[in-house]
């Protein structure tokens, strides 16, 4: 099976980022995905890299990730997603969960 690699960049209203240098959550498995956040000085921007077997949903990925950036105000971060046929709502939920967990790690 061929995998599609997508790359996006988003402007962020904020430069809120995670404190750990990186954070990983999830497992690539049937209908799910894994996400990694990497802290990086990007002038407030967000870079997103997606590896997926699903062809033809580039615009959906872009809109979902743009919504995540706009909703959370996160910036100065690289988001890497390894997808295994997760639906858009599952992807959105997983990246929100990962950010919540990464933020919780900061409080410890």
Task: Enumerate the predicted regions with their spans.
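N-terminal intrinsically disordered, cationic/polar leader segments
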Residues: 1-108
């Amino acid at each position: 099976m061929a995998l599609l690699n997508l790359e996006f960049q988003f402007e962020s209203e904020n430069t809120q980022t995670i404190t750990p240098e990186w954070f990983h959550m999830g497992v690539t498995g049937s209908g799910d995905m894994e996400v990694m956040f990497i802290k990086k000085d990007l002038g407030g921007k967000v870079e997103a890299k997606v590896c997926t077997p699903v062809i033809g949903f580039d615009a959906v990925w872009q809109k979902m990730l743009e919504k995540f950036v706009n909703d959370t105000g996160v910036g100065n971060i690289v988001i890497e997603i390894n997808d295994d046929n997760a639906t858009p709502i599952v992807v959105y939920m997983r990246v929100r969960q990962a950010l919540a967990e990464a933020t919780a790690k900061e409080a410890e």
